[in-house]
Amino acid sequence: APREAITQPFLETTREDFQVALDISTYSFVALTRAAAPLMVRRGGGSLLTLTYLGSERVFPNYNVMGVAKAALEASVRYLSSELGPQQIRVNAISAGPIKTLAASGISGFSDILSVYRAHAPLRRNIDAGEVADAALFLLSNAGRAVTGEVLFVDAGYHAMGLGEIRNDDQ
């Protein structure tokens, strides 16, 4: 989605920006699946994987319309898995925590995001791209043959936390 559609209040999202976000983040995966499914059927099955983000379930500052688009993507994963399962085609998503990359360095306040994740994740650390790749290998390989319609969180447990640790600062 255009940068202003992410940073402006959600209520100010235009129809065009909404459509762009859904087209790029959701429909593109459906279109890719439509193209790949016949090839996978001929091979006796396969596995499709997409990336999503916790902003699909929770409100994150400066994510706005992308959160709605990712929620639609996750629903699409479930519907596609139901439709394609009988042909032995698995459809899943990975919801990764923030990863320190060159692209991420351009995100305002990204070091603060990393700090919050590290402080509140049960594993008390951030993740790296290799850990996301390992999860993808599992889901795409025969090791994940019984997994479909799922969103696998690779975020050091951050998604599982409610308020996080409550500290008594009065003492």
Question: PLM features: residue spans?
Answer:
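A glycine/serine/threonine-rich, flexible loop-to-helix segment
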Residues: P86, A96-A121, M161-Q171
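Alpha-helical segment proximal to the catalytic Tyr-Lys
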Residues: P38, S82-E83, R145
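A conserved structural motif in NAD(P)-dependent oxidoreductases
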Residues: A121-V132
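Short C-terminal tail/terminal secondary-structure segment
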Residues: L137, T148-Q171
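Catalytic loop of short-chain dehydrogenase/reductase
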Residues: P2-R3, P9, R15-D17, A21, ...
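Short, small/polar-rich loop/turn modules that mediate ligand/substrate recognition or access, typified
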Residues: G85, R90, V147-G149
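A short, exposed helix-loop element centered on a Lys and neighboring polar residues
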Residues: T33-R34, R78
